[in-house]
Design a protein with these regions (language model features):
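Residue-level detector of intrinsically disordered/flexible regions characterized by low predicted structural confidence
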Residues: 5-10, 94, 122, 166
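Charged phosphate-binding loop/patch that engages nucleotide di/tri-phosphates or the phosphate backbone
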Residues: 153-182
């Protein structure tokens, strides 16, 4: 009988892997511009070049038994510090959007249980001030973003990590009538 190679991981069959249930949040200010954050630690996860160019809208997992709308408001507060009382949900995606992780992350991220994420998107109108944003969360939450800004929706496709681009294309198309025009 041969010895098992402890350094080899079992082959992952992508077709057997599920998508992680998740929400995405589009926050619009009074000028219909979109809140985006630059990924903290992007060099190790989303940005192998380390040039810090990957930005995204808030997103995160849906907890067991949690409604997607509640998850959207929770994730918004965890990642941006924006309180649910400062926003109003004005739209919800008509479908769930999916993306697959790149091969080097599949089987590693989220305990190796998911091939990617399946996201329900919400558009929120922000009625607060920029000073209401706090991207340094209270423990035990990790910092998601190291910078933030308001952007025109047509900037986003050039700023998002490539493996999420198709989701952003779909979301931006679905909600195009809500965004500021240049």
């Amino acid at each position: 009988m041969g010895k098992k190679d402890k350094n080899k991981s079992p082959k992952i069959d992508i077709d057997d892997m599920a998508y992680r249930p998740c929400v995405g949040v589009i926050v619009l200010n009074a000028q219909d511009m979109v809140w985006i954050g630059r990924r903290a630690g992007a060099k190790t996860v989303n940005d192998p070049t380390g040039d810090g160019r990957w930005w995204q809208m808030p997103q995160g997992g849906i907890d067991r038994g949690e409604a997607p709308r509640a998850a959207a408001l929770r994730e918004l507060e965890e990642e941006t510090g924006i309180d649910a009382g400062k926003v109003e949900i004005i739209a919800e995606s008509s479908t769930w959007y999916r993306y697959d992780l790149p091969g080097d992350l599949m089987g590693k991220k989220w305990g190796g249980r998911y091939r990617g994420q399946e996201q329900k998107w919400f558009v929120l109108r922000f009625a607060g001030a920029d000073s209401d944003v706090n991207i340094t969360p209270e423990p035990p939450h990790e910092i998601e973003f190291d910078a933030w800004r308001w952007a025109h929706a047509d900037e986003l496709l050039d700023l998002i990590v490539p493996f999420k681009r198709q989701v952003y294309e779909g979301v931006l198309e679905e909600f195009a009538d809500l965004f500021a025009k240049r």
